């Protein structure tokens, strides 16, 4: 709900102001450590943490298998309906250590309309 989101934003803001979360320190942590730190905050889940790592910290090897847009673009790329986490992770293992970069290309394919015939955000 909107009220929950407001309380989460306030909580994150307080954590930053109280220096319980120092955003610049995340740069020095491993991906797993940064995700753990972010998800320790109420309202910050795995999806949000991974998006922060990919788009703010510019981490190169984060695979956003929880993201609907990524999965739809993955379906388009590989012409498959199998988007189970295990299947996606196995197929995308070859992208490492550049998984985030590959994911960004898939997001770009979506943004530019390349996937429009196959992309259905809500079926």
Task: Locate each region found by the language model.
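C-terminal accessory module of base-excision DNA glycosylases/AP lyases that mediates lesion recognition
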Residues: 31-33, 46-123
């Amino acid at each position: 709900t909107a009220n929950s989101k407001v309380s989460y934003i306030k909580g994150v803001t307080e954590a930053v102001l109280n220096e319980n979360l120092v955003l610049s320190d995340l740069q020095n942590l491993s991906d797993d450590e940064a995700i753990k730190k972010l998800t320790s905050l109420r309202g910050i889940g795995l999806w949000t943490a991974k998006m922060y790592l990919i788009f703010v910290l510019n981490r190169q090897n984060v695979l956003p298998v929880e993201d609907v847009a990524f999965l739809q673009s993955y379906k388009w790329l590989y012409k498959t309906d199998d988007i189970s986490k295990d299947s996606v992770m196995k197929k995308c293992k070859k992208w490492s250590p550049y998984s985030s970069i590959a994911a960004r290309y898939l997001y770009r394919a979506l943004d530019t309309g390349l996937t429009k015939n196959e992309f259905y955000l809500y079926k």
